[in-house]
Amino acid sequence: MKAVSWNVNGLRACLNKGFADVVRELDPDFFCVQETKLQAGQLDLTLPGYTSYWDYAEKKGYSGTMILAKKPPLSVSLGIGDEEHGHEGRCVTLEYPAFYMVTLYSPNSQDGLRRLPYRLSFEEALRRYLAGLDAKKPVILCGDLNVAHQEIDLKNPGPNRGIVSLYSSWSTTTFAPSRYSAFSTSTILE
């Protein structure tokens, strides 16, 4: 299985710069996209061999996620299963017999951390959502998590030092594996 994830920061502009060619060249089973910045009906994206599944933000020109998939899923879910966070087009989940494929665009805390309370609330809801999926079958999560796990992941760590420790704690807790295998993240996150 091959999956690609890309924050396009506006799919319409990206289409004019060879998006379809990239999909064809890479030929993934799943192409997960964040920040589509589209509303329903604004774009007819037809790529041979793929079906698209979208979660649109209510706010025009904002957020949005999409998965292009070669095989049809058993089910499709939009959002993270909670009303407070269901209006920004942040998550598409496709269910298959052996796994869930999830694309996610996490909210940014923004300058001055003015959206930090919303971000923390989103993270808690996301943790519950992913744990619920993981209790049923494995989860493959692709996306832009808007998080730096350690200081080395930041271009300018000085002013962001406190945020790194906050996000490091969240990502370690959220992504610690519930099942251990050769591909577990436990050694990466500890």
Where are the language model's segments positioned?
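Soluble or luminal CAZymes and related metallo-dependent hydrolases
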Residues: 11-15, 86, 118-125, 166
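Structured beta-strand-rich core segments of catalytic domains in phosphoester-bond hydrolases
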Residues: 37, 42-109
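Active-site-proximal beta-strand elements of phosphoester/diester hydrolases
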Residues: 1-9, 98-110, 142
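Active-site beta-strand/loop signature of hydrolases that rely on acidic residues for catalysis
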Residues: 7, 23-41, 101, 130-151, ...
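Surface-exposed cleft-lining segments at the edges of enzyme active sites
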Residues: 81-82, 106-123, 156-163
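Metal-dependent phosphoesterases centered on the DNase I-like endonuclease/exonuclease/phosphatase
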Residues: 51, 122-190
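N-terminal, active-site-proximal structural segment of metallo-dependent hydrolase catalytic domains
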Residues: 1-47, 57, 62, 78
